[in-house]
Each structure stands twice: as C-alpha cells, then as structure tokens.
C-alpha cells in the first residue's frame, strides 16, 4: 500500500521539484530590497549579492550531483561554509539557514 507520505517524499526529491518552495524562501528572506540576483536552474540555485565594487561578492548556492547536494556559502571574501547532504530536505534546511545568514550579513554591513 502506498501512503501519501511516500508519494510526497518521492515528488520532492530534486531541486527542480522544489522550485516553488525555493522561490518563496528567496522572496520571504530577501524582500527588504537587497540588491541580489536569484538564479534557478534544473540542478543549481544561487543567490548572489550584486556589488560592482567587489570582484568576489557574497554568494549562496546549492548544487545537485550524483551523491546528493552541496550547499556553499561565500561571504564576499572567501568560502565560509560548505555542507554536503544526501537528502534534499536536509540540504534545503541548510540552504535556508545560510540564506538567513547572508541576509543578516547584508543588513549588518549595509550592502543593499
């Protein structure tokens, strides 16, 4: 017997199938007028700070690969955090945590 929980788990197994959830996350966290760019592709999502004075601007990205998902956070100076997750739901939780961190840093340093 197939349960609804099993169906939902099977449906939300990729970045592409979580598009609405990811877009809503971006809109809710970065609605304060931050100058950011949102890039969504089938197996890649990025939130990048648009700063012409910085050749290496702050960037948050999630990549889907054969082993799972890689979430990378660049703070504008160096690679600050990399998390590998085998499961999309855990990867999205990490992505959300780091998106909040990115927004907080943009607010703190008034980079919007």
Language-model-detected regions and their locations in the chain:
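Short arginine-rich
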Residues: 97-108
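Negatively charged, low-complexity tracts enriched in Asp/Glu with abundant Ser/Thr
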Residues: 1-53, 77, 108-112
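A short, exposed loop/beta-hairpin motif centered on an aromatic-Gly-Thr core
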Residues: 76-90
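Short aromatic-glycine-(Arg/Gly/Cys) micro-motifs in beta-strand/loop hairpins
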Residues: 53-80
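Charge-rich, solvent-exposed alpha-helical interaction surfaces
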Residues: 7, 25, 91-94, 98
């Amino acid at each position: 017997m197939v349960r609804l929980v099993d169906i939902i788990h099977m449906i939300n197994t990729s970045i592409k199938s979580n598009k609405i959830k990811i877009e809503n996350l971006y809109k809710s966290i970065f609605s304060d007028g931050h100058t950011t760019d949102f890039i969504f592709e089938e197996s890649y999502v990025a939130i990048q700070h648009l700063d012409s004075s910085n050749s290496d601007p702050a960037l948050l990205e999630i990549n889907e690969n054969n082993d799972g998902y890689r979430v990378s956070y660049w703070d504008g100076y160096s690679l600050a955090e990399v998390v590998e997750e085998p499961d999309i739901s855990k990867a999205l939780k990490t992505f959300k945590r780091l998106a909040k961190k990115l927004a907080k840093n943009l607010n703190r340093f008034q980079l919007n």
